[in-house]
From Swiss-Prot:
The keyword Cytoplasm does not apply. This is Serine/threonine-protein phosphatase PP2A catalytic subunit. The active site is at H114. InterPro entries: Calcineurin-like_PHP_ApaH (IPR004843), Metallo-depent_PP-like (IPR029052), PPA2-like (IPR047129), Ser/Thr-sp_prot-phosphatase (IPR006186). Its EC number is 3.1.3.16. It is an enzyme of class 3 (hydrolase). It comes from Helianthus annuus (Common sunflower). The keyword Manganese applies. Its cofactor is Mn(2+).
Length: 305
């Protein structure tokens, strides 16, 4: 097992945007022993800073830490989608996992729909691992670890955080607590819905244009919040141009933390600071200065930007 000094050395190495050579397996093994003890609805205390999609935009993650404060000084909650699309998925996910192992009570990392074997084989993480390591071992270590990530989090029993959205199969938090999460993300069903669904202007449940999950209306979100004694659903999963977007009569907020998404969308990013008294403050930020782009052929399909 790596010591704290080993982890500090690894984190310092990763902060320079350098992949770890051979220590990834040990790091993932240690992270698994931590994550297996966490819940499907992981309780989180305030103050905490809530973050949306990162998608391999490593230098923008460093900018996020510059704006929001470094770990462990700031307590962080990340709502998934650490990999794919950006050029530095390996460095991004390795840094977040190393921070989790080093400061387990100061960072919560949830599962997004991209923390999946199938999706990462299409949208970049698998190919990046092959390019940077010469084989798929690191990809396998991380995708095996992804099965253990909590699905949702609950800040002070009031703010419900997850990657995607609600499910017609899940009326209560106890329904979510009863799921068996330690598996590849299924193509359908409640676990899939939590990672894939989106809020919609239309009431009720709808068919998702993504081909997985559902759309859910303001009536659904309001009922879920009322049933479970919640003040807010905080989620990520969708590009919003200002970095955050209130919807569904303020029952739902979307947070997106990858500025200039895919290096071309022109959006701002945001994070949400939840204070000691549950007060809410959004911090917006622009992309970090562009680095020299790696020589990568961009063949990944857009699916949903």
């Amino acid at each position: 097992m790596p010591s704290q000094s080993d982890l500090d050395r690894q984190i310092e190495h990763l902060m320079d945007c350098k992949p770890l050579p051979e220590e990834v397996r040990t790091l993932c093994d240690q992270a698994r022993t931590i994550l297996v003890e966490e819940w499907n609805v992981q309780p989180v205390k305030c103050p905490v800073t809530v973050c949306g999609d990162i998608h391999g935009q490593f230098h923008d993650l460093l900018e996020l830490f510059r704006i929001g404060g470094s770990a462990p000084d700031t307590n962080y909650l990340f709502m998934g989608d650490y990999v794919d699309r950006g050029y530095y998925s390996v460095e991004t996910v390795t840094l977040l996992v190393a921070l989790k192992v080093r400061y387990r009570d100061r960072i919560t990392i949830l599962r997004g729909n991209h923390e999946s074997r199938q999706i990462t084989q299409v949208y970049g993480f698998f190919d990046e691992c092959l390019r940077k390591y010469g084989n798929a071992n690191v990809w396998k270590h991380f995708t095996d670890l992804f099965d253990y990530l909590p699905l949702t989090a609950l800040i002070e029993s009031q703010i419900f955080c997850l990657h995607g959205g609600l499910s017609p199969s899940l009326d209560t938090l106890d329904n979510i607590r009863a799921l068996d999460r330690i598996q590849e993300v299924p193509h359908e069903g409640p676990m899939c819905d939590l990672l894939w669904s989106d809020p919609d202007d239309r009431c009720g449940w709808g068919i998702s244009p993504r081909g997985a999950g559902y759309t859910f209306g303001q009536d659904i979100a309001a009922q879920f919040n009322h049933t479970n004694g919640l003040s807010l659903i905080s989620r990520a999963h969708q590009l919003v141009m200002e970095g955050y977007n209130w919807s569904q009569e303020n029952n739902v907020v979307t947070i997106f933390s990858a500025p200039n998404y895919c290096y071309r969308c022109g959006n701002m990013a945001a994070i949400l600071e939840v204070g000691e008294n549950m007060d809410q403050n959004f911090l917006q930020f622009d992309p970090a200065p562009r680095q020299v782009e790696p020589d990568v052929a961009r063949r990944t399909p857009d699916y949903f930007l």
